[in-house]
Amino acid sequence: MTIELTHTTGLDPRSLALRTAMDTETFGLYSEWFASMPEQERARLDAALHTDQEDLTEVVIASEDGVDLGHAALRALADGGYEVKKVFVFPHARGRGLSRILMKEVEDVARAKGETRIVLQTGEKQLEAIALYRAIGYEPIGSYGPYAGLDDLVFFGKNL
């Protein structure tokens, strides 16, 4: 397996295609949960989870033989530091360690920018993601930044 890592931004059409695939999968996991929420709460959650493509200034795409397999990104937080966003590997490419490769790469990018800590948010139904984050040294933290008070989500941080 020869995996190529491409550094780009959220404006890259390849990044958009991968994020769209991730959003489709994630919506399937959480559609009943979203539907059961009061409208005001759902609107607040939608606003917190929304990511403008322009805000993804550091994106890493994993590909093999010209075929995109996965994606991870960094978004600068308003109060400083970086958040890992949109970690996704297509189902047919899972089980090959690509998420670990992508996470290491975005951590290295953050470290090169002088960061000493990185955070991320995921959902409680994304058990494989939670297991990965714990396995690579992320620890549970409280809500932060745009997610303040959204305690139904799962938050992790890691010292770099």
Residue ranges and their predicted role:
Residues 3, 7-11, 25, 113-119, ...:
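C-terminal "cap" of GNAT-fold acetyltransferases
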Residues 66-67, 81, 90-104, 108-113, ...:
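Conserved glycine-rich acetyl-CoA-binding loop
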Residues 3-85, 90-91, 103-105, 109, ...:
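Acetyl-CoA-dependent GNAT
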